Amino acid sequence: EERLDELLDEAWSVSRRRLRVYRPYPRYPSISITGGWCELDCRHCGRVYLRSMEWAESPELLERRLLKLSSTGAVGCLVSGGYTREGRLPVKPFLKALRRGADEGLRMNIHPGLVDRKTASEIASAGLEAASVDMPGDPETIRWVHGLDAGPRDYVRSMLNLSQAGLRACPHICVGLHGGAVRGELNALSL
């Protein structure tokens, strides 16, 4: 715990000296394929993040939005949304629309939640370049925050599935996710 405090202090000091602000909107917006819907309604977000995203709740709406982004010079987008009770983004109905966006040259990142090999392969085949994967390192945090019966290894498995499918897998480690307490973050770094 003491070592973690030292590392956090050092990270804060460095961020004050070298922090660059990147504002992706409007050239790289976040799009929710579920609108404001999320079965998890977890303690991490409580559907709040979904409110700030553009909504494209059907494959047709998503395709139109992606084509508009392409025609207006956007770089790409983050594809996200609410999760099922199993911690998964219901992306399968949207894969053809995503492929169309990729064919138009959009660079897309997805926040898919937990994924199996087949889904990871389908996401990669749709032309997405990267996947952002939450990496909680404490099973109790996963249960308390997300309400999932999953463990850190399930997130590692998702990351490996996405990486092996050809996507750039980007781990997200949220410090203090467990109600502000630091639990499992160092473990997540070692996974």
Would you name each region that the model predicts?
Residues 47-60, 69-92, 101-119, 123-156, ...:
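Core AdoMet radical
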Residues 14-15, 104, 165:
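Helix C-cap/helix->beta junction micro-motif
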Residues 34, 102, 163:
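Gly/Ala-rich phosphate-binding loop of Rossmann-like dinucleotide-binding domains
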Residues 158-183:
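Conserved strand-turn element in the central/C-terminal portion of the radical SAM core barrel
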Residues 2-5, 56-63, 152, 186:
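Electropositive phosphate-/nucleotide-binding environments in soluble metabolic enzymes
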Residues 62-65, 93-98, 119, 154-161, ...:
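A general structural detector for well-ordered alpha-helical segments in enzyme core domains, enriched
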Residues 1-39, 43-54:
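N-terminal [4Fe-4S]-dependent radical SAM core
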